């Protein structure tokens, strides 16, 4: 899992049927920008929790996605 900040959204007029109805966000992580499928209704400026890789594809019923926003982070603290 990774934490990132939503910096924008991605729109498309046409996309694969398996992505129909999906919203995509641009998320800045410590490793750079990623495009992630949004499952929680996050918006610009929100700090979010991402799952990536094979877990992300399984979470979206094997849709061809590399990252999924699964939570909006309310706060963090050091152990």
Predicted features and spans:
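Short beta-strand-to-turn element immediately C-terminal to the catalytic PLP-Schiff-base lysine
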Residues: 27-29, 51
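Generic structural signal for buried aliphatic residues
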Residues: 11, 48-49
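N-terminal first-folded block
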Residues: 1-27
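Short alpha-helix capping/helix-loop boundary micro-motifs
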Residues: 32-37
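C-terminal structural segments of small proteins and small subunits
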Residues: 49-79
